[in-house]
């Protein structure tokens, strides 16, 4: 079975009840419809993948090189393009150019990995960015309460090691959360109810793929 995936939009979080009347927090993801615009094969490209297109956009806003890709695939231009890597060469036989993918590719109770862009927090200090404890609030501490402390020795090593955790820009990173449970698939509305939190803001683009660390349930 080829690894499945779909592009979608995060709509927000809510809560539903399971069969035991327990509250389940879920993220609602508008999944698809996606269209397959290109198929990568090991013989031609060196790897196996399918290119997925998603979202509405005015054709006037798409440049000519990208428009040519859509024309070759025989589909209307879309807002987003992404590649879904496949496990092996045989997996590409399950896809064809122009094929439409919807939320129904997943089933209730399956596990997925969700990739999105985390919310940007701007410039943040070490306490917020890395969870530092800070320094004393009293007993002679003056204007150092949220400072990081020492970042290295003076004479040895006489430099700051690469990767030292310091203040800086926080968020707006590509984040993947693995092994999230698909609580319910609403095929009529084209949405997935995924248990737990999903990276990114409401309205952000996400890629939902079958979990790589768990087999098909």
From Swiss-Prot:
Record Gene3D superfamilies: 3.30.160.810, Translation factors
Listed GO CC annotations: cytosolic large ribosomal subunit
GO biological process: translation
Key word Iron present: no
General function of this protein: One of the primary rRNA binding proteins, it binds directly near the 3'-end of the 23S rRNA, where it nucleates assembly of the 50S subunit.
Family named by the database record: Belongs to the universal ribosomal protein uL3 family.
Assembly notes: Part of the 50S ribosomal subunit. Forms a cluster with proteins L14 and L19.
Protein name in the entry: Large ribosomal subunit protein uL3
Organism expressing this protein natively: Mycobacterium marinum (strain ATCC BAA-535 / M)
């Amino acid at each position: 079975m080829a690894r499945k995936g779909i592009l979608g939009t995060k709509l927000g979080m809510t809560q539903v009840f399971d069969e035991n009347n327990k509250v389940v927090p879920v993220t609602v993801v508008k999944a698809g419809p996606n269209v397959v615009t290109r198929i990568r094969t090991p013989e031609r490209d060196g790897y196996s993948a399918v290119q997925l297109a998603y979202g509405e956009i005015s054709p006037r806003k798409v440049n000519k090189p990208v428009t040519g890709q859509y024309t070759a695939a025989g589909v209307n231009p879309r807002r987003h393009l992404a590649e879904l890597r496949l496990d092996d060469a045989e997996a590409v036989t399950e896809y064809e150019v122009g094929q439409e993918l919807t939320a129904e590719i997943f089933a209730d109770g399956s596990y997925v990995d969700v990739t999105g862009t985390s919310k940007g927090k701007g410039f943040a200090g070490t306490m917020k960015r890395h969870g530092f404890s800070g320094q004393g609030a009293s007993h002679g501490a003056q204007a150092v309460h949220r400072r990081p402390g020492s970042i290295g020795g003076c004479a040895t090593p006489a430099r700051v090691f690469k990767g030292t955790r310091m203040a800086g820009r926080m968020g707006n990173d590509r984040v993947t959360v693995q092994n999230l449970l698909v609580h319910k698939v609403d095929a009529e509305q084209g949405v997935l109810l995924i248990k737990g939190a999903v990276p990114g803001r409401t309205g952000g683009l996400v890629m939902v793929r079958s979990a790589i660390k768990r087999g098909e349930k």
